[in-house]
Amino acid sequence: MSKVFLLLVLSVFALVSCDALSAPVGSKLSLSKTDELNAQPIDAKRMLRAQEEPTNAADEERGMTELANKFKAWAAAIKTWVTNSKLVQSMNNKLASLTQKGRVGQIEKLLKQDNVNVNVLYQNKVKPDELFLALKLDPKLKLIADAPAAWANNPGLSMFYQYATYYAKMTTKA
């Protein structure tokens, strides 16, 4: 398949190039009667702008800008199509959940150490939400985390509240 495509591209290139089918200089071709009135020498330049002085080749466009704009639009359309596809979104969600589970596992190992305090957690760049997940607290408790009555029933809740206030204080300082 690729050989056929390559052969097709090469043949189109040979037909389109300006010198592919030019007549040899000084050939003896007969002109028809209608062409005799407007006859030009065979070896004359055949370009539309042949009489103009040559300019900077970088200034000439020759259709490449249109092709480049079409290609950019096509690439942008494909990018949005791919990013909006359900497969890519599900893969991103799966990757995010796996990284979150890994991070929560690291925090759980950190919590099992004896000398864990809010400074150690902050130095390890633990976010309060990650700590909440690592402590395996009920999500409803997040609303009443500042109540000392709730701390008695949930021992990890007081640690979460202390760290959340410390984290808020440290992030507002920076």
Curated annotation (Swiss-Prot):
It is found in: Secreted; Host cell membrane. This is RxLR effector protein 207. It comes from the Eukaryota. A motif (RxLR-dEER) lies at residues 46-62. Residues 1-20 form the signal peptide. Changing K94F: Leads to the transition from disordered structure to ordered structure and abolishes the function in cell death activation. Residues 82-99 are annotated as: Disordered. Coiled coil: none annotated. Interacts with Nicotiana benthamiana ACD11, BPA1 (binding partner of ACD11), as well as BPA-like proteins BPL1, BPL2, BPL3 and BPL4. The keyword Signal applies. The RxLR-dEER motif acts to carry the protein into the host cell cytoplasm through binding to cell surface phosphatidylinositol-3-phosphate. It comes from Phytophthora capsici. Disruption phenotype: Exhibits significantly reduced virulence with smaller lesions on Nicotiana benthamiana infected leaves. The gene is RxLR207.
